[in-house]
A protein has these predicted regions:
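Bacterial Sec-dependent N-terminal signal peptides
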Residues: 1-22
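Signature for phosphate-centric chemistry
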Residues: 20-152, 156-328, 332-423
Length: 423
């Protein structure tokens, strides 16, 4: 009987994983630009859905962390590692007409990066202006309190984060010119906004083996190599690992959707199955480094803890009698926001899974696209009781480990106790 139960349990897990894979394929078929996950442009909610707050409660304070918006590649190496191989193949007349077209697309991407590597694009600016606009429309009362007109914004020293902060605050100023802003950036703020120092050493050999196995199993390079290269034997001098070479080219080109040029659309050079395979590998890669998983033993939690400590400290000050603070805004990186989301065990991330399961449990294009964000909206009644609602990428969410008091609303005292237990 016990064995029968175990078999049924394993079967249920297998069916669930299959369903998730099929769902992922469906989402990618709808929009293949989702396939490079963290390069994907922010998808704002088509319609803002708000569960009404309990009677008598009004919003009065917002605590926020946002990833920078769409950007250029943060390092030229992300273009050059694939393009340099393409250039070598071209120099030795080894590229087919299709291969030459791929190379031309990468050169278009590279040319667009001149002088702006790592900077925010216009699309990234628009994303943060849009999020700020919807934040204001969603909670106008927060920003219209006569005794709470101060908005404090902080950013890491990285230019794209500073640009994101400026665009966000610019939009809030348009919404309400009477708001008073302070905007600060620097290494001092990166100490808690995006600090990976002090992480314990974790052997990555198992993770690397999983990733190698995943790309080997999922991606068949034969069609692409035959389509791009005239003489594969001669090309071996330059292409040492066909799968990784293909991934480098795909990664370099996928940033096109974020740029201020017409996207050359690298996806046209790949079949859907190839795109899916590259997505699965990329998804697992970032799950391995940005989320709590079995292989890294939740090592990234420390990054999230530093942000959470700041959230708690600033919330305590904002909740004090006489505070003039309407909002605390933070601007940083995916490598910090993702560990925070993982640390909190937000719905869908309650458990740590193996990196091998990443494509079944974590979709990077949904969880951590450009301009992804977490918002905590604080409400209180005339008695001074405080409730909090969480918005993840502007959509209501919950933390299953903590019981809500009604709908998505938490008693702040209980949520604060839970947050404190995570530090």
């Amino acid at each position: 009987m016990k064995r029968f139960v175990l078999v049924l349990s394993a079967l249920a897990v297998s069916i669930s994983a299959f369903a998730q894979r099929e769902y992922a394929r469906e989402l990618l078929e709808q929009d293949v630009t989702r396939s490079m996950n963290l390069h994907h442009n922010y998808e704002a909610p088509e319609k803002v859905v708000d569960t009404p707050a309990p009677k008598g409660y009004k919003p009065f304070y917002i605590s926020h962390y946002g990833r920078h918006g769409s950007r250029y590649h943060w390092t030229a190496n992300h273009i050059d590692r694939g393009l340099s191989i393409m250039d070598s193949l071209a120099a030795h007349d080894l590229l087919t007409e299709e291969g030459a077209a791929v190379r031309a697309d990468l050169w278009q991407i590279k040319d667009a990066h001149k002088g702006v590597v790592g900077y925010l694009t216009h699309k990234g600016a628009e994303q943060h202006q849009g999020i700020a606009h919807r934040m204001y429309e969603r909670c106008p009362k927060v920003f219209e309190q006569k005794d709470r007109q101060r908005v404090e914004a902080v950013s890491t020293a990285v230019q794209r984060c500073i640009q994101s902060m400026a665009n966000f605050c610019l939009q809030l100023t348009r919404e309400n010119p009477s708001l008073q802003f302070t905007m600060d950036a620097g290494e001092r703020y990166a100490e808690y906004l995006s600090n990976s120092s002090g992480l314990k050493y974790v052997d990555k050999s198992r993770t690397n083996a999983i990733l190698d196995s995943l790309i080997t199993t999922e991606l068949d390079p034969s069609r692409i190599m035959a389509s791009w290269i005239k003489d594969e034997a001669a090309a071996e001098k330059y292409v040492h690992n066909p799968r990784i070479f293909i991934y480098y080219v795909f990664w370099a080109g996928s940033i096109g959707q974020c740029l201020d040029i017409e996207d050359p659309y690298i996806y046209r050079h790949f079949t859907f199955d190839e795109i899916y395979a590259l997505w699965a590998y990329n998804d697992a890669y970032y799950y391995s480094s940005m989320c709590g998983n079995l292989e890294n033993e939740r090592n990234e939690d420390l990054i999230g803890q530093r942000i959470l400590k700041d959230i708690l400290e600033k919330a305590d000050l904002a909740l004090k009698e006489g505070s003039d603070k309407a909002a605390d805004l933070r601007f940083g990186h995916d490598s910090a926001l993702s560990p925070l989301i993982s640390l909190l065990r937000i719905e869908g991330l309650e458990e740590a899974h193996s990196v091998a399961q990443a494509p079944d449990v974590w979709f990077g294009f949904r969880s951590m696209p450009m301009a992804s964000n977490l918002q905590m909206i604080f409400y209180k009644n005339k008695k001074g009781d405080v409730l909090v609602k969480l918005l993840y990428n502007e959509r209501e969410t919950t933390i299953p480990a903590v019981q809500t008091c009604c709908g998505p609303y938490y008693k702040w005292s209980e949520l604060r106790e839970y947050f404190t237990s995570l530090l």
